[in-house]
């Protein structure tokens, strides 16, 4: 009888340890994806910050807000006599295969056409770049993130703009979705 009780107590303890280990593995993976989301949000904020205030990419010319965090928005923006087609979203793929680290991001060429630039870093130090017109098919290890951003005029006070970037992992390899949002205020 005592042996049976000891086996039951031991079994419960081992099952508890297995559940704990599973949760630790999932939490560790989710932390990795949150960290990558934070890096991509920060990268986009820095990218948008480099434009002059009157550039169509960051100008809010009609209404109080440009862009959307809930859907992909493209707008025709005129500022300082220049009219540009501006996307308030992009896609970034990160992949590690064969020792190479690749990042593919979407953008527009001089004619306003969407293209995808892939930059690959090899272990030898070689860096290659390629541009294609369609998003490359993801491999099994590819993480695909979607970034959307808004630019708010006179928020939180007059004379400044608040830029908010939302990064979402679109092919989650973990059960819980991964979203990361970051904002900055600039004149």
Question: Positions of the model-derived regions?
Answer:
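Aliphatic-rich helix starts adjacent to a transmembrane/signal segment
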Residues: 1-43, 51
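Low-complexity, Gly/Pro-rich coil/beta segments used as flexible assembly/activation regions
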Residues: 35, 39-187
């Amino acid at each position: 009888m005592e042996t049976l009780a000891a086996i039951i107590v031991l079994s419960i303890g081992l099952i508890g340890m297995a559940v704990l280990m599973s949760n630790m593995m999932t939490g560790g993976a989710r932390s990795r994806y949150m960290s990558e989301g934070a890096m991509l949000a920060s990268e986009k904020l820095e990218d948008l910050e480099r434009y002059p205030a009157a550039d169509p990419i960051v100008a809010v010319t009609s209404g109080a807000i440009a862009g959307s965090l809930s859907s992909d928005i493209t707008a025709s923006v005129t500022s300082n006599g220049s009219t540009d087609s501006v996307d308030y979203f992009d896609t970034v793929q990160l992949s590690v295969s064969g020792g190479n680290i690749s990042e593919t991001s979407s953008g527009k060429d001089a004619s306003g056409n969407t293209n995808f630039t892939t930059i690959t870093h090899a272990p030898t130090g070689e860096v290659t770049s390629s541009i294609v017109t369609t998003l490359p098919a993801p491999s099994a290890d590819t993480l695909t993130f979607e970034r959307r951003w808004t630019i708010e005029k006179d928020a939180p006070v007059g004379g400044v703009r608040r830029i908010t970037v939302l990064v979402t992992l679109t092919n989650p390899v973990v059960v819980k979705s991964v979203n990361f949002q970051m904002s900055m205020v600039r004149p």
